[in-house]
Amino acid sequence: MKKLISTTLASLFCVACLNAQTFDMKVAQPCYNDSIGYGWDVTNVPTAKELKKGLKRPVYFSVKVPDGNYKVTVTIGSKKYAANTTVRAENRRLFIEPLSTKKGELKTFSFVVNKRTPYINNKMSVRIKEREKDYLTWDNRLTLEFNGTAPAVASINIEKADVPTVFLCGNSTVVDQSREPWASWGQMFTRWFDDGIAISNHAESGLTAGSFLASNRLEKILTMMKPGDYVLCEFGHNDQKEKMAGSGAWYNFSYNLKKFIDQVRKNKGNIIFVTPTQRRNFKDGKIQETHGDYPDAMRAVAKREHVPVIELHDMTRTFFETLGEENSKRALVHYAAGTFPGQDKALADNTHFNTWGAYEVSKMIVMGMKQLGLPIVSHLRPDWKDYSPAQPDDFNKWNWPLSPIFESQKPDGN
């Protein structure tokens, strides 16, 4: 696994790292190390035979770069063989869905990847959790994952990108989940935007609005933010479990939401609230409310402070009720024992989404942005199609080649 960059190394990146870097993936490339600054990572280096006849497994390629937004241009396919490739970045952020190419067929795509470390300044860093130290999102490199039944990448170009950024704040329903079969809408959200927008997901499992602030995550965002950037905040799941003095929807939670508003606006950013996703809790075919006053408290703060709201709470209720009590399990981490390597017990989680569920929820977020008339929806990809949670996509057509890292333990939060 990749090591976190130390604060002392943060200032030592060479100027060359800021320029465009192009890699010919048809020839042998080294195994990544910090002194070289690029190479195959995470899994075994492709063999000469694999490069000649084609891969049948996922591979990762990393490039050492400073914090920031990077336009990544990949040419996928091969002149030697037919291929099937999906492209993700960092912690399984989806950019290109599985795409088949014929022998000799090459296709080029561009997208923007946000890369960061915990470093803020010489006196402050993000206080990440122990589990985050193995994440591909907090280290000193930008990592691309090439997956699929026969992944093929011909070339990679990486260059700095000066584009608007959408920052995501939240908990386990938003975070870039690092391991199968867990997923959240934040890591699917990247799929829908062209190379004129960056998505920077700072959410983490188990966080409340208060612990997000206390761990310096908003401070990190503010150091990266430019005037006109966006900040989306989804909280409420874990906040309702706080028991300290002053906790509750109408005091501590509301007060912390106001802190987000004030700090983002002070830095000339645009803040948007997202009401929490529903839990799968049915009675007589209807979803039962489990979040208490927290969604209403968020709405009240938003109304008072003139903050736009994406009603994910309502959309996910419609989504679950449309699927029904049994079929709604398909959107969440419900799997029989033995479904995944090393999984000796059944998984039954009514809060956390699997990849299909997260993909569907990401579409709800985009629809919420469209309904609010946000200018950044002009950067939606040409293949975007409007979505309704009352008409979900066909689960049986979902295709997600598994990343090679699995975990049976639930993410923090419930």
Residue ranges and their predicted role:
Residues C14-C17, G196, K268, H306:
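A generic structural signal for alpha->beta connector loops
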Residues M1-Q21:
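Bacterial Sec-dependent N-terminal signal peptides
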Residues D139, A161, D194-G196, K266, ...:
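Short, well-ordered coil/turn elements that cap or connect secondary structure elements
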Residues N19-E180:
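Compositionally biased, intrinsically disordered or flexible polar/acidic segments
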Residues E90, N216-P382, D386, A390, ...:
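Alpha-helical cap/lid subdomain in secreted, periplasmic
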Residues L144, G148-E204, R217-V231:
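Serine-esterase "nucleophile elbow" of acetyl-processing enzymes
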